[in-house]
Amino acid sequence: MFVVLASLFMACGTPKDGYVVKGSLKNAGDGYAVISVADHTGASVIADTAEMSGGKFRFEGKTPFVAACSLRVVPEGKEVLDMLIVLENSPIKLQGDWANLERNTGGSFFIRDMKVTGGKNTEVCNLLDEVYFSTRRLPEFKDYERLEKWFASLDENAELTDEVMRKADTLQEIEDRFRELVFGKQLEIMAAHPSSEAAALYLTPMIDGMKLDEFERVFGLFDEAVRNSEMLTDIREELETRQRLAPGRIAPVFSLAQRDGQMLSLA
């Protein structure tokens, strides 16, 4: 996957049916931007680099399939911004103001009110992301961010007092309710976009909490081409592993060569 993507990222010229990624980040200044992809080991490898001048940068090329990529923006003398983009053969525009750079509770930076527009998969990502942000704004989650910051500030050796345990339990209850609402609404959007690889990728944080039959049902909502796409390899392999290990399922046949050359089959 990486070799194919990297060779196409680095291709000269602008393919008529390829992608153009344009960034316009006010107040970012000069620097550079980097697109990285994961190799077969999961390690992040740089695929292309672009100079940034006055907050503007540009990538162009062609990808043989939709791919989840890491975009890193590195302004001179400023904080570094890392974000995920779904690369597809269409124009993609990123617009924002570096003055709105903020840090989330996990320590990563993001640009508040950043706008990303593009092809089908980018627009589906926007729909799914808006579910997250709109749910966070609901009155019932007004204490969510405060408790997240409190939890992140705790020392690993902090004393587990009754107050600490009470707040931790409250945070867990809020998180469980938040995930329930967000995942439910996102699943509705996924069902409405069966041809979107990006929609299926958003299953990633959900599958740990899914039983096998639900996992099979939800993944089966997507078109066959989507289910077999490169970007969903990890999800597909997780499903196949669960299916093999599920009680009552027919086990795969394994063949083992014996010393006399005969094959021993185990099922």
What kind of feature is each model-predicted range?
Residues 2, 36-40, 152-155, 167-169, ...:
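Short, functional N-terminal and low-complexity linear motifs
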Residues 12-174:
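A non-transmembrane, solvent-exposed segment enriched in polar/low-complexity residues
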Residues 80, 93-95, 101-104, 179-246:
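N-terminal targeting signals for export/organelle localization
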Residues 233-267:
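N-terminal "domain-start" segment that seeds a small globular fold
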